[in-house]
Amino acid sequence: MEKNNEVINSIQEVSLEELDQIIGAGKNGVFKTISHECHLNTWAFLATCCS
C-alpha cells in the first residue's frame, strides 16, 4: 500500500505539459529523441563501420 502512495505522489508532481509529452499527446504526438532526428542509414553506418 505504501508503494501505491509513492507512485501517486510522483505522478502528482508531473505537470500536465510534461505528461502530454510523455504519453505522446503533445503538439504533434511525437516524443523527440536523438534517433527521431537522424536517418536509419546514419545509424547503420555507425554500427557497422568499425566491425
Curated annotation (Swiss-Prot):
MF term (GO), any: signaling receptor binding
Entry's Gene Ontology BP terms: defense response to bacterium; killing of cells of another organism
Record field: transmembrane: none
Modified residues (2,3-didehydrobutyrine): T48
Mod. after translation: Maturation of lantibiotics involves the enzymatic conversion of Thr, and Ser into dehydrated AA and the formation of thioether bonds with cysteine. This is followed by membrane translocation and cleavage of the modified precursor.
Superkingdom classification of source: Bacteria
Cross-link (Lanthionine (Ser-Cys)): S35-C49
GO cellular component: cell surface; extracellular region
Residues joined by cross-link Beta-methyllanthionine (Thr-Cys): T33-C38, T42-C50
Main localization, broad class: secreted
UniProt cross-references to InterPro entries, sorted A to Z: Lantibiotic_typ-A_Lactobact
Keyword field: Antibiotic, Antimicrobial, Bacteriocin, Lantibiotic, Plasmid, Secreted, Thioether bond
Localization per record: Secreted; Cell surface
Proregion residues excised on maturation: 1-25
Family: Belongs to the type A lantibiotic family.
Role played: Lanthionine-containing peptide antibiotic (lantibiotic) active on certain Gram-positive bacteria. The bactericidal activity of lantibiotics is based on depolarization of energized bacterial cytoplasmic membranes, initiated by the formation of aqueous transmembrane pores.
Name this polypeptide is given: Lantibiotic streptococcin A-FF22
UniProt lineage: Bacteria, Bacillati, Bacillota, Bacilli, Lactobacillales
